[in-house]
UniProtKB/Swiss-Prot annotation:
HAMAP family: Aden_phosphoribosyltr. It comes from Clavibacter sepedonicus (Clavibacter michiganensis subsp. sepedonicus). Pathway: Purine metabolism; AMP biosynthesis via salvage pathway; AMP from adenine: step 1/1. This is Adenine phosphoribosyltransferase. It comes from the Bacteria. The gene is apt.
Length: 191
């Protein structure tokens, strides 16, 4: 018998997404950590969602479906990178990295945004796509909306159309959605 005759049937390693909504799956996997990173803060940890094959697939499928046809997917550093890469792969398009200031070499576009005590900046390489390209912007959490607002402005300054903004979790009481008025915002789960 030749070696090729003894092949085992291929194993299907694809995740089996349960017949449940993406929001129910995220809710079931989400960890709530009290007093992190400081006393009085209730931290919502999405890492168990991303670590679970069915959870990750449900999140990516949901965000891709909500985004419609796009030319690329942009992710905000850091967990937005994970979502954007997976969504871009699932959509058959490329991905753009919206980085913290000082992390990209060469020419960059920069947007600053206010923090509670100071300001921060994010950057993007210009000219990665044709002008007018439709880009889906993803991040893990929508809180105050400052980072996503700056990221959307950055993409628009680069000459791209923000086709939509998608997040896994929206912390609705922090009012971030209002800062993103004029954009189609999709949250899988809103608390």
């Amino acid at each position: 018998m030749r070696l090729t005759d003894r092949r085992r049937p291929a194993t299907d390693y694809r995740c089996r997404v349960p017949e449940t909504s993406a929001s129910d799956l995220v809710r079931s996997l989400l960890l709530t950590v009290p007093d992190f990173p400081q006393p009085g803060i209730l931290f919502r940890d999405l890492t168990p969602v991303l670590a679970d094959g069915a959870g990750l697939r449900a999140v990516v499928d949901n965000l891709v479906a909500a985004g419609g046809p796009v030319d690329a997917v942009a992710g905000v550093e850091a967990r937005g990178f994970l979502l954007a890469a997976a969504a871009a792969y699932a959509s058959g398009v490329g991905t753009l990295a919206v980085r913290k200031a000082g992390k990209l070499p060469g020419e960059v576009l920069r947007e600053t945004y206010a923090l509670e005590y100071g300001e921060a900046a994010i950057e993007l390489h210009p000219g990665q796509l044709a002008p007018g390209s439709r880009v889906l912007l993803l991040d893990d959490v929508l809180a105050t909306g400052g980072t996503l607002e700056a990221a959307a402005r950055l993409l628009e300054r680069a000459g791209y159309e923000v086709a939509g903004i998608g997040v896994v979790l929206e912390l609705a009481d922090l009012g971030g959605r209002a800062r993103l008025a004029g954009h189609d915002v999709h949250a899988i789960l809103s608390l």
